[in-house]
Structure formats: structure tokens, C-alpha cells
Amino acid sequence: MKNTSSLCLLLLVVLCSLTCNSGQAQVLFQGFNWESWKQQGGWYNMLKGQVDDIAKAGVTHVWLPPPSHSVAPQGYMPGRLYDLDASKYGTAAELKSLIAAFHGKGVQCVADVVINHRCAEKKDARGVYCVFEGGTPDDRLDWGPGMICSDDTQYSDGTGHRDTGEGFGAAPDIDHLNPRVQRELTDWLNWLKSDVGFDGWRLDFAKGYSTDIAKMYVESCKPGFVVAEIWNSLSYNGDGKPAANQDQGRQELVNWVNAVGGPAMTFDFTTKGLLQAGVQGELWRLRDGNGKAAGMIGWLPEKAVTFVDNHDTGSTQKLWPFPSDKVMQGYAYILTHPGVPCIFYDHMFDWNLKQEITALAAIRERNGINAGSKLRIVVADADAYVAVVDEKVMVKIGTRYDVGNAVPSDFHQTVHGKDYSVWEKGSLRVPAGRHL
């Protein structure tokens, strides 16, 4: 009996360990850009042909574009939420087929959820666009001006609650304190999971509603993966350069995930800003005053999704782009570091960086690097950054070629490119077709 109990306890520990590790060892892939809606034959159909390559890069979750009817073709001005056939990316059937293909490779699918604002179908008696259509034969999501925040005076009739977050000028801000809004959006979010097949969400413009609202939807729908867009600015000095201390920005990100709880994470905009400033001859920025990573990953890496660029910051919008000639330094950093790294479609396929990105992702996977991995920064100078992760992987980015004795003798270089190198501890591992 004693032996049986011990065996059961051992199995429980192993199972718990595997579950915890698998929950942390995530890699997100953004499966679209700002121009994807223009794809001949449909974006969903085109992306389906790249499922194998995406899965081979160690991706565990793919972020897909907003799925519903939208006034703007990219999907970020949604109207008839249940109408997936009106999407510029493809039909509902094509979306479900794409999701099934990803699921067949063990990759989960994340919906881009735009619920802060919504575009109306018709005008009311005042001549204001504030009468909404849900996209079904019944009255689900068929709302009027009373479902709009009262302080959104351009559209509201003044009967709703005040906005719980930041305003969005281009479309009506939805009153998430309204019980019907909460009930019907919860039903729609659950429908995306049960009927369409989505596993998680990316919350667009999550600063537009309170953390209490986000928490309510997360707890009601129980998505397996949640990452929010909390796009905040770096702190800057009077000379226009980023300040050495970026605690204010990363504290805002940490506060959001702590308030929402559960699986909720945020994109680490602090790390993105510091990394793209750092690779331009200021790599010292990547270490804070306590010797830790200077972004959100230095404080709460398990809840930070790191990225180099996305459809807003890069692509054709270029609202805050990473230096184009240094993108692989960015991937060498995020794919070897704590946090959940996000690979951007453009870099993987349009920029022909698939081989380099996949090689870095393979190092992450075979060494078990995950969101909570231990980071030890060895060098953080203007022209060189060197760090060790889990005492198994060492990475160098920057223009400096010689980092002296920073690399121990039992570490062997397995991947290198322009201004970056990665070493692994133990026996020499040389990928097929590569010569060191």
C-alpha cells in the first residue's frame, strides 16, 4: 500500500510538472499583416498552405485576424459580429477549415477580439449611425444607442454608462456595464470557441475598457490563451531618447495582468521599445539597475508576450518599426529569452527569414526555454549584449565580434547570423547543412 501511494504521488508530481512546463513553453505566431485582406483567393486559404512551416517553427499558438464583418477591410471596425462570411479574409467555412488544419498539427488558434467599439448598421431618428445588427435572423447583438457609452456623445443617446476606459474616436464605444451587452458578447465569445473552433483571444485596444470588464469576460468564457494589447509609450528624456528607467510603463503592464488574472497576458511593449533602441548602439538599455531585463520580462516574464513587430508597428503602417536591418537581432533576443515570443508573418515569409527564425525556435524548444526561464545577463554594453538562459543557452547580439571570456568552454556555437550568435551547453550540435 505504501509503495502504491508513493508511486501515485510520483506520477502526480511528474504530471503536474509536465502540465506546468507545457503551459509555459508557448510560441505565438501572428498569422497576418495589414494588407492580408487583399490576398487573391482569400487569406485563410493561402495561410492553410503554410500550416506545416508554421508548426515546424515550434509555434504553439497562431493569432488570426478579426473574423467578423467590418466596415474597414482589416477587421478592426466590426459590425455584424456573427457574420463571418463577410470577412475580407475568407468565408466562415474557410476559417473553420484553416483552424482544423492548425489543430491537426497541434497548434491552437487565437481570435483577434475587437469589442471596445463597434460600427452600426443604420441611422436612428437623429440621423446618427447607432443602430447595430448582429448578423443573425434573431435579435442577438441588435443594439441601439443605449448600448453606447454615455460620454461618447457623437453616437450615444446619453442613457448608457460612462466609458470605463479610454475613448476610441473612430467608432461608437460600447457600454460594457450594460447587462445585455455583457450577456450577448459573452455568448458570442463562447460561440467563437464552441462553433468556430478558436482556443483563445488577442484583445484589441484593451485600454478601452476596465480590467474588471476584461476579467469578467475571461472568467465567463474561460479561454485557454489571452493576450491584451496595452500599447503604452516608453518614458523619454528631454533630448527625445528613451529614459534609462522604464519602470512606469512595465508597471502598467504588470498591473493589468494582475488585475485581470487567470491566463491573461499582455504584449511587452516596453521590451519592444528598449530592444529596438538598444540594437542601434545602446544595448546597455536591456539591463535595468538591478541587473535584470529592463522590460516587463524582467518583472513578470510568465505574463509577457515579446515581439519584434506586428501589423501596426511594422507591415505597411510602420507606426513604430524595428530597424529593418537588425530584425534578426530582435529574434535572437526574444526566441532565447523568458516571456512568450511572438513571430510576425512578414518576417517569417515575406522577408525570407524562415530558416533563421526556425533555427532559433528549435534551440528554444530543445533546451526547454519557456516563459519563466531564468535569465542571467553577462554583458550589457553599447555594442554588445550577452546573456545566459537556464544555464543552457547563451546569446550575443550587437556589432562587437569578440566578447572575450564571456563564453565558457563547454558552450558551443550552433546558430549565428549578422550581429548575433547563440551557443548551447554540452555536446556540439550542428544543424544539418550548416558549417561553423
UniProtKB/Swiss-Prot annotation:
UniProt record, GO biological process: starch catabolic process; sucrose catabolic process
Record site: Transition state stabilizer: D312
Binding-site residues, Ca(2+) 1: N116, D163, D173, G208
Tissues expressed in: Is expressed in all tissues, except in immature seeds. Is the most abundant alpha-amylase isozyme in callus.
Signal sequence region: 1-25
Pfam families associated with the record: Alpha-amyl_C2, Alpha-amylase
Keywords: Calcium, Carbohydrate metabolism, Glycosidase, Hydrolase, Metal-binding, Signal
SUPFAM superfamilies per record: (Trans)glycosidases, Glycosyl hydrolase domain
Amino-acid positions noted as binding substrate in the UniProt annotation, renumbered to this chain: 69-71, 76-77, 202-207, 231, 233, 251, 292, 298-300, 311, 317, 396, 401-403, 413-419, 423
Catalytic residues identified in the record: D204 (nucleophile), E229 (proton donor)
EC number per UniProt: 3.2.1.1
Highest rank taxon of the organism: Eukaryota
UniProt record similarity statement: Belongs to the glycosyl hydrolase 13 family.
Role played: Important for breakdown of endosperm starch during germination.
Extra remark beyond the main annotation: Binds starch not only at the active site, but also via accessory binding sites on the protein surface that are important for efficient binding to starch granules and thereby increase enzyme activity.
Entry protein name: Alpha-amylase isozyme 3D
Species whose genome carries this gene: Oryza sativa subsp. japonica
